[in-house]
């Protein structure tokens, strides 16, 4: 099995990228406006320890999806999880362009975008299933990730409020 056909590449890419965010977001927020329009970058979280909770939760999801994919030999599950991750990486580049500045996560995004595309292409070659399954699984995973992202930002905000006595 080659590196790019492993179901375990996605969690590794995720941790490499999110480590940059976890380390750099708090200091970046001290000197930069965190809003793009009405949307606040990084879910409004200002502390690395709280951000780490959200990163850990997402990492566990990626590990679970990779494990299930490995156990049932179903690469489409990892493909479906990699697509929102790729969009997340692209979003960092877009945010940096909009801000005309460095945004935490942009360096690893630039490094990882080509790697992630190659990874997706390798996994797609391994996926030999009906087209309807592609649509169902990809839509289900996108919806699950969107709901989870909203959920984890609410949880992180509440934890930050409680721990750092905000509000």
Question: What residue spans do the PLM features occupy?
Answer:
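N-terminal signal-anchor transmembrane alpha helix
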Residues: 1-22
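Transmembrane alpha-helical segments that form the membrane-embedded catalytic/substrate-channel core
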Residues: 15-22, 85-96, 143-157
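Cytosolic, membrane-interface loops and tails of multi-pass inner-membrane proteins
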Residues: 21-45, 155-167
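Core segments of transmembrane alpha-helices
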Residues: 51-69, 111-117
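Transmembrane helix-loop-helix
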Residues: 59-87, 133
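Hydrophobic alpha-helical membrane segments
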Residues: 83-92, 103-123, 144
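Terminal transmembrane helical module of multi-pass membrane proteins
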Residues: 118-167
């Amino acid at each position: 099995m080659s590196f790019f056909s492993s179901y375990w590449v996605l969690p590794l890419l995720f941790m490499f990228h999110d480590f940059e965010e976890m380390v750099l977001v708090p200091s970046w927020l001290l000197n930069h406006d965190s809003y793009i329009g009405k949307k606040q970058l990084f879910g409004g979280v200002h502390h690395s320890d709280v951000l780490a909770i959200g990163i850990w939760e997402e990492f566990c999801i990626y590990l679970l999806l990779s494990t299930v994919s490995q156990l049932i030999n179903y690469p489409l599950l990892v493909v479906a999880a990699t697509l929102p991750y790729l969009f997340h990486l692209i979003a960092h580049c877009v945010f940096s362009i909009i801000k005309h500045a460095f945004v935490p996560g942009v360096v690893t995004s630039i490094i990882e975008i080509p790697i992630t595309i190659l990874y997706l292409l390798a996994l797609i070659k391994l996926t030999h299933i009906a087209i309807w399954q592609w649509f169902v699984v990809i839509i289900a995973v996108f919806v699950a990730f969107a709901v989870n992202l909203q959920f984890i930002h609410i949880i992180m905000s509440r934890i930050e409020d409680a721990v750092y006595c905000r509000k």
